[in-house]
């Protein structure tokens, strides 16, 4: 089933999510607060990613067919108009995310899932800025999600169970491999495991076991 998806913030993560959703057959609207960011950078990055996937035989249809489902939006409100799912990928600053989710809460349809790509911030620090915060959660990907399917779904204490279930279903149908956290923890699971591995690697180098 084709859905309407909005990607808010179109840097590396936001652009990669656009690839994920458009490749899955969804209509994707892109918005970035930086003037010209979508046209100058995001669309080019998206096309380059799709070209790579096509070269590797990883696309089921031509690049142009997928690109035809992606459009730049004139505003945040334009991007989320009629959206079923919104993926936020803006700066990792609580104040910025609170402002964005407040705007999303006002502009997005009441039934839309509002998800954040935050890589470290607990969702409860900013998701409650949105109206009806029970439809909000964190969907933290491995970067870039267009190539690595793992995504951590982390509900805030106020996130509805139905929201988690719908997000899991939507992301899985888009080709991702969602795992769900039982409750919040700073850095989520993946980052904490990665940091532990890096710390041990540095310890081994420091002790002279390897270089």
Question: What residues fall within each predicted segment?
Answer:
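Hydrophobic/aromatic beta-strand patches that form the interior of the parallel beta-sheet core
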Residues: 29, 73, 87, 137-139, ...
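Rossmann-like NAD(P)-binding element
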Residues: 33, 37, 52-113, 121
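Amphipathic alpha-helical segments within well-ordered protein domains
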Residues: 51, 151-154, 199-203
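Rossmann-fold dinucleotide-binding core
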Residues: 113-192
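Active-site-lining helix/loop region of Rossmann-like oxidoreductase modules
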Residues: 188, 195-211
